[in-house]
Swiss-Prot record:
Function as written in the Swiss-Prot or TrEMBL entry: This b-type cytochrome is tightly associated with the reaction center of photosystem II (PSII). PSII is a light-driven water:plastoquinone oxidoreductase that uses light energy to abstract electrons from H(2)O, generating O(2) and a proton gradient subsequently used for ATP formation. It consists of a core antenna complex that captures photons, and an electron transfer chain that converts photonic excitation into a charge separation.
Gene Ontology molecular function terms on file: electron transfer activity; heme binding; iron ion binding
Family: Belongs to the PsbE/PsbF family.
Taxonomic superkingdom: Bacteria
One Pfam family cited in the UniProt record for this chain: Cytochrom_B559
Family annotation (Gene3D superfamilies): Photosystem II cytochrome b559, alpha subunit (1.20.5.860)
UniProt keyword annotation of Transmembrane present: yes
UniProt protein name: Cytochrome b559 subunit alpha
Organism, scientific name: Synechococcus sp. (strain JA-2-3B'a(2-13)) (Cyanobacteria bacterium Yellowstone B-Prime)
GO annotation terms (biological process): photosynthetic electron transport chain
Subcellular location(s) per record: Cellular thylakoid membrane
Cofactor: heme b
Length: 81
């Protein structure tokens, strides 16, 4: 015979009005916060990734791929100039 964990059944939670009042506000707020985080460029600044227009500069149009694993430092220095 299975014992009870003392928690509310999942069906009771998702059919309650309180659940939907809380989540009707928080889910759209999280979506909006994420959209603002990315669209303002703050995500690029925090994580240090280049913006889409910064991948290729006017001087360097080739792909920055390291192909020689034994001389990787020299290649990285050449690619980042």
């Amino acid at each position: 015979m299975a014992g009870s964990t003392g928690e509310r059944p999942f069906v009771d939670i998702i059919t309650s009005v309180r659940y939907w009042v809380i989540h009707a506000l928080t889910i759209p707020a999280l979506f909006l916060a994420g959209w603002l985080f990315v669209s303002t460029g703050l995500a690029y600044d925090i994580f240090g990734t280049p913006r889409p227009n910064e991948y290729f500069t006017a001087e360097r149009q080739e792909l920055p791929i390291v192909s020689d694993r034994f001389n990787a430092l020299e290649e990285l220095e050449r690619l980042t100039r």
